Amino acid sequence: AIVGTVIFALLAFLLPSDVPVDRNGKIDWVGAVLGTAGLIVFNVAWNQAPASGWDAPFESILLVTSILLLLLFGVWEHKFANPPIMPLGIWTAPSFLALILVVLFSFMANGIFLWYMVAWLQLLRGASILDFGVQWTPFGIVATLGTFLAAWLIPRLATQWILAIGSAAILVANLLLATMPVYQSYWAQVFPATLFMALCPDFVYVAAQIVASNSVRRRHQGVAASLVGTLNLYGNSLGLGFAGTIETEVNKRRVGAEAVLGFRAALYFGAALGLVAVLVDLSFVRVVKDVREGWSDPADQREVEVELEEGVSTAVEGRQ
């Protein structure tokens, strides 16, 4: 992180300034606030519930408030925003809604796996932080290799299958943890589960970006890519809220060694999310192998030509 900060700070001074393509562009600040606030409050409601309980009055208030904010966001984007920060027409693009569900469920399952793997090893098996760090090493190696493997597969395999591999990987990973005994050798189930889990983020993220880019119009590609990127962290966090509620309910009136039942229930829920992601992907996401060059849609090609003309004109004005 320190090295990255130094490098990016230097690049901020060394790189030339971007040439503005749309000098008169506007940002939909109202939509940004409504959408972000709605998602945050919804997340807080679910992640606070395991500790406070759903019978706490503020939980209902938070949940209702989040829904109202998201409804207001939709109304604002549809009726008043110009231009909208998230054009609602993007949801009618082929495979896009199904893609978002697959990505959300996959990353929810991913967050559940990560949290309960740490909890199982440290709380039930007594592993130290250093022990866990060593046992987590295979993740970094396989995840790095998975990035290159996903990129290699893109021109060779239909993207929905790459997405399915990532979702199936987190399904298997959660099942391996959910079915293991409290005390067991690391190599028996935790190690293979870590290897499977390492494939999920890169396969799902890379494939989802390809599907999003192929599904929407060129002008909406930035929005689609940003939404997929947001679901990466948001899904991880939201999944813990759902899983935490399940764990809390299962472990009511259970103490000691019986607490593992709550862990298992949460991990089975993560596996169920992975299974639903696989089924939705195979049923509704359809993108062929990406071997195109340029823009196949004439309207998109015209947008590129206009942007290039405006960019050249702006650059000439800047030099003058």
Predicted regions mapped to residue ranges:
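Intrinsically disordered, low-complexity terminal tails of fungal membrane proteins
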Residues: 287-320
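Flexible cytoplasmic inter-helical loops of multi-pass small-molecule transporters
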Residues: 18-30, 79-86, 291-301
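Select subsegments of transmembrane alpha-helices in polytopic membrane proteins
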Residues: 27-36, 164-166
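Helix-loop-helix hairpins in multi-pass membrane proteins, especially solute transporters
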Residues: 1-31
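Phenylalanine-glycine-rich, low-complexity intrinsically disordered regions
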Residues: 19-21, 36-58, 73-76, 80
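12-transmembrane solute porter fold
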Residues: 57-58, 83-254, 258-284, 288-289
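Structural signal for membrane-spanning alpha-helices in multi-pass inner-membrane proteins
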Residues: 8-15, 42, 47, 70-77, ...
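Structural signature of hydrophobic alpha-helical transmembrane segments
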Residues: 1-5, 63-66, 136-138
